[in-house]
Amino acid sequence: MPRFLSQHEYDVVAAVADLVIAPVGDHPGGRALGVADYVDNLLGAFTVDPPLIFAGGPFSGRAGGDASFGDFLLLSRHEELAWRTRIEGSQGLPEREFNGPVRGYQETYRDGIAALGSDFLACDADEQLRRLKAQREFRTLFYVQACEGAYGAPEYGGNRDLGGWNAIQFPGDVQPRGYTDDEVARRA
């Protein structure tokens, strides 16, 4: 069950993920990579404590060391204010509007998904693309976050089964092992 989005909104985000990062050839596409999970975790980051903002570390455990990326870090009060403002918007709160009103990710997603239409999932791909192109603010934000979700650290909810890294032939995080001199020389 989604953390922030309704099931319909989640399904729309998954469909849009495949429009933006299409499944082509060996690339699985945005839906299969868990972009909707990443977006939902980001939008609902403050539904858990600590919030899903900064993954722990120093190691993921994928190349040795203790797996601690999944242990999210507490935020300072300034970090929390900044991230809540970014995600939730200023909401008329003086402490969030010192530079004026801020439209948050949550509002951008809710409005963008609604503007795509309640029948978006039933439309063919050409109509879905036409509608998505008409929603510039939503499309622009989504593109950035779809790339983060598809190719970022899987602890944030995306890059399912490391499929994004595999699709772009990225070996992923290698600490604490690191790279050998030979591996570095061959990549140059």
What kind of region is each of these model predictions?
Residues 1-3:
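Short, Gly/Pro- and small/polar-rich lid/capping loops
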Residues 6:
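Short, flexible, mixed-charge glycine/proline-rich loop motifs
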Residues 9-19, 26-188:
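Mature-region segments of soluble proteins
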